[in-house]
Amino acid sequence: MNCFSQLENGIFATEKDIQELKNKDSAHILVYSDSHGKAPVVRDIFEKFGQKCDAAIFAGDGIFDLLALMEKANSYDEISEWLPPVICIVRGNNDSGSYETSFCRAVHVPKKVLLKVGAKRILVTHGHEERVQHSTELLESTANLMDANAVVYGHSHIPVENNHVIYSMNPGSCSYPRSLSKPGCAVLEISEKNIFSIFYKIDFSIFGLKDFVPYFPDRMY
């Protein structure tokens, strides 16, 4: 459960929770991006995966959807239990740089965050400034300059996992997928020697029920 104190720009956690994340031998990180106003989908993602994860990363475009869930968690204990102890957010091209909430007068949202998980340093950014819809070359160069071991990004709305130059992943959009992909999210599995992602697509039944189904993105390198 997250106490919603903004320890530093882009990260909600206590100093203790941040330190515990840095000291972990292995960790599970919930990753999603580009909700674009679909707050109910964000709620479903956290209800399904939040309690099982050590942290959550939102890679931009739809910050208000997450902040709305955090507002509700302030009033409902059940919802607060869905939120992991560390939450990392970055600003997308459709997000504001700051928000006012009941739990934090000024939520400052940076364009980039370097999140330390165990022995890994994860660069989190939306990716629009690095033009990821065309290539990840600039993104990988930025990660190298920041001494990152991995990159999480969004913007393209296309799920991708790339382990060629540096490990990078895009969970795709949880609401508006592109290029015949499915709406979904991912769980980043991190250990001292390895890092990989399990992708989940959201399947909708005729009754409106949602199911999260593991799958391999079409674009993997």
Locations of regions flagged by a protein language model:
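Binuclear metal-dependent phosphoesterase catalytic core
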Residues: 2-23, 118, 146, 170-221
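Flexible, glycine-rich phosphate/dinucleotide-binding loops
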Residues: 38, 65, 96, 131, ...
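His/acidic metal-ligating clusters that form di-metal
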Residues: 49-55, 66-68, 100-166, 220-221
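Short C-terminal domain-edge/linker segments immediately following a structured domain
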Residues: 60-65, 124-125, 152-159, 181-185, ...
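Core catalytic region of metal-dependent phosphoesterases/phosphodiesterases
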Residues: 2-117
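Catalytic metal-binding/acid-base residues of hydrolase active sites
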Residues: 36, 62-63, 94-95, 128-130, ...
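Conserved beta-sheet core of the metallophosphoesterase superfamily
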Residues: 74-78, 85-88, 132-197
